[in-house]
Amino acid sequence: LTGCLALSLSLTAMAASVKEIELQGNFDGSVTAPTGETMPVTAQIVALGKGEHVAKISVADALVEVKGMTKGKAEDGLCLYEQTIDLGPEMGSFKISGKVENRVFSGTAEGSDGMHKFSLNRVEKGSPTLGQKAPEGAIVLQDGTNMNAWIQEPFWDVRDGVMNMSGHSIRTKEEFPSMQLHVEFKTPFMPNEEPGSQARGNSGVYVFGRYEVQVLDSFTEAPRDNLCGGIYQKAVPLTKACLPPEEWQTYDIEFHAPKFDASGAKTADAIITVKHNGITIHDKVVLPSPTPGGVSDQEAAKGVLMLQDHHDRVEYRNIWLKPID
């Protein structure tokens, strides 16, 4: 009953926030100057909770932030932006008046040279490896049909081709050697949690059950070791690659296990390369020891794959690995 109630509440929350989800994300378009000249403009909009949003707008060499507020109920899907911004002595100040509605961010920017008009469409950039099929020789851990490869934990299940997490971290039944690993994940929309906090769609992919690559809604946030893509307490991503919540993302990981001699003494550290949504965020990073929270603080030549439960509704699908070496 508890599980059914939780599922019902989760689905209700999702349905109520679909239009609010569309108020945030990536937007691409153009701005037209009073002269008729057009130039490209992009925006990344983050939901801050209680109807508040911030649009991080990039045009020419300028990056500005404009705050917005939903009109009426958030689920009605209308956010208004009214703010004056200063772009420095060369460009001057502009009075921004705009709105996001029906997946379009449009409006005007009034400056000393007249009225500029902008229009941007919401886009889902996706990952080039999204939906990638397991190659020959790979071991499929999750194909959307069952949980056979995993040690079953309460409330974990597969629905609509997606593995849903709840209550406990989960690990594979088998241990594996060095590998190429593909994982697809989706973080939940949690606008009332502070951006950049650990409470905004938290989970983790533990390679060998010991080395965590963080999963988190870190859309637009500067890279940190404890945000999405970070190797917890070990390495900061080289660049931002996080997509908005409720959009499927990918990790493509090449992991070389630590090596040991016949006596059990370690002769080489683990090495990891991570691509997040097709972008290299860790390149041959040496891992001298495990990260916290895994199955063991002792290293090994083989290990399980573990997905961390951190009390948030993170979803996984299309998980496979191919042994290497």
What spans do the regions from the language model cover?
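Carbohydrate-interacting regions of secretory-pathway proteins
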Residues: 16-21, 33, 37-325
